[in-house]
Amino acid sequence: MKKLFVVLTSIFIAASAYGLTNSTLIDFALTGNADNLQAGEGDTNEVVPVAENLYNDNWVVWLNESARLTENRRNSYVTNVDSKGNNGAWEAGKVLGVRVHFPLAAWNSYALVKPVYELEMYGGADGTKYTEGKGVIHNVGEIKSISSWVYGRNYLISYFVNLQNEFGELKSYPMGTVYFNGWRQVRWENREYLPNVRDRVLVREPLYPRMIPSVKLDSLGFYRTKDTKGGDFITYVKDVTLEYDVVVVDFEEDIDDEATWQLLKTENDRKQAIESARIREQAELRDLEQRRIGDGTAADQGAAANTGAADTGAAQEQAQ
């Protein structure tokens, strides 16, 4: 906990002192290997294990309401795919394979590829359950760019990376289309980013207590316009990487605010409890549904699990 809640200083001072940081938000070579997703020390009582939520085969495809027909839902899913390493760009390993069955009719539609359960921003014993390439990055200031290795198959489909911040606010970042063949690193650039400190508006920021700005992966979005042919769409994703300014500067202070007041720990525990309760509810509903259809075939069970997650996402969207 202490590691997570170090003293905050101004974002501008941090940016000038430390420069830009590159971190991998999600690496599907990592999540495609179950051995990399074992629970850490102190996380044995977690509601949903990391492996159950993040293993590539367990991700789901959620279609928008007008596209959520039975055939489309049944034929939209993900799988764990072997990659040869893009001619040595990375080690041979796993990537996320995505199949979306868009409506054949000429109307706009989209698909969201996401984990079974929403990622916990503050999960785990020290808030790092989903960090280090598993979907969460702490200490994120202004984002300069987002890049992603994606394998195209000449589909005129737009690709988006959807992120949530520490307040639960959702923002979509357009990565361009996947209208190409083979691997390509697509990129979103922040046109308002000012690399020179002299060009920035410098202000003093309150230091304590203040939660560390963080981001987590909400979903990967694929958007198809009505002018684009419907039916099957295939793509593969290797990773998502962020380039950003850090906010937290870890240096020695005369007084340890957090040790004295523990305000950040209290707020973190509160948010962690809310996240755990929400995920526990989803897990129980899925478990009950799985028992109800337990006499079906394995394929039917997989389709039902994907459909159940889509229904949960729809309910959350309507509630908002």
Curated annotation (Swiss-Prot):
Entry keyword set: Bacterial flagellum, Periplasm, Signal
Biological process annotations from GO: bacterial-type flagellum-dependent cell motility
Low complexity compositional bias, start-end: 295-320
Residues spanning the membrane: none
One GO CC term, this protein: outer membrane-bounded periplasmic space
Domain of life (superkingdom): Bacteria
Signal peptide, first to last residue: 1-19
Positions of region (Disordered): 290-320
Known role: Component of the outer layer of the flagella.
The protein's assembly and partners: The flagellum consists of an outer layer composed of two sheath proteins, flaA1 (44 kDa) and flaA2 (35 kDa) around a core that contains three proteins flaB1 (37 kDa), flaB2 (34 kDa) and flaB3 (32 kDa).
Protein's recorded name: Flagellar filament outer layer protein flaA1
Species the sequence originates in: Brachyspira hyodysenteriae (Treponema hyodysenteriae)
Gene (UniProt): flaA1
